[in-house]
């Protein structure tokens, strides 16, 4: 007997974007250089090389990326708080879900 397809919950497009880690900021900044230095490397291999390079950094070299990560975390927490407040106040944050739209249509 085939499994029934799970209905996944639609993600609200207005949900704040998650905060990035210090390593992600490092990866974004260094991926292109790593790609030119290793032109035959696959995406996964580049990730491994970036991870190895990240582990070799001193705490002083990591600091700018960690600062960016702290600032991004503050941004995320601020935006998430605003988003949660809007939800609690009943403000619409995006398109209505299918069940909510069906219920609204049924009431009319």
Swiss-Prot record:
Biased composition (Low complexity): 96-108
Keyword Transmembrane helix: no
Ranges in coiled-coil conformation: none
GO terms of biological process kind: chromatin remodeling; DNA repair
Pfam families: HMG_box
Primary localisation category: nucleus
Subcellular location: Nucleus; Chromosome
Region (Disordered): 1-20, 61-108
UniProt KW Nucleotide-binding keyword: no
Keyword entries, A-Z: Chromosome, DNA damage, DNA repair, DNA-binding, Nucleus, Transcription, Transcription regulation
Compositional bias segments (type: Basic and acidic residues): 61-85
Residues of the DNA-binding region: 16-84
GO molecular function, one term: DNA binding
Subunit structure, as described in the record: Weakly associates with the stable spt16-pob3 heterodimer to form the FACT complex.
Family: Belongs to the NHP6 family.
Task performed by this protein: DNA-binding protein that induces severe bending of DNA. Required for DNA-binding by the FACT complex, a general chromatin factor that acts to reorganize nucleosomes. The FACT complex is involved in multiple processes that require DNA as a template such as mRNA elongation, DNA replication and DNA repair. Also augments the fidelity of transcription by RNA polymerase III independently of any role in the FACT complex.
PANTHER family linked: HIGH MOBILITY GROUP PROTEIN DSP1, MITOCHONDRIAL TRANSCRIPTION FACTOR A, ISOFORM B
Protein's name according to its UniProt entry: Non-histone chromosomal protein 6
Record organism: Schizosaccharomyces pombe (strain 972 / ATCC 24843)
Gene that encodes the chain: nhp6
């Amino acid at each position: 007997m085939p499994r029934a397809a799970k209905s996944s919950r639609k993600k609200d497009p207005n949900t704040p974007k998650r905060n990035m880690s210090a390593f992600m900021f490092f990866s974004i900044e260094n991926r292109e250089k790593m790609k030119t230095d290793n032109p035959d490397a696959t995406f996964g291999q580049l990730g491994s090389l970036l991870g190895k390079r990240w582990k070799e950094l001193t705490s002083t070299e990591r600091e700018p990326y960690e600062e960016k990560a702290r600032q991004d975390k503050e941004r995320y927490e601020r935006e998430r708080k605003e988003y949660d407040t809007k939800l609690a106040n009943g403000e619409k944050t995006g398109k209505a879900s299918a069940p909510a739209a069906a219920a609204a249509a049924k009431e009319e």
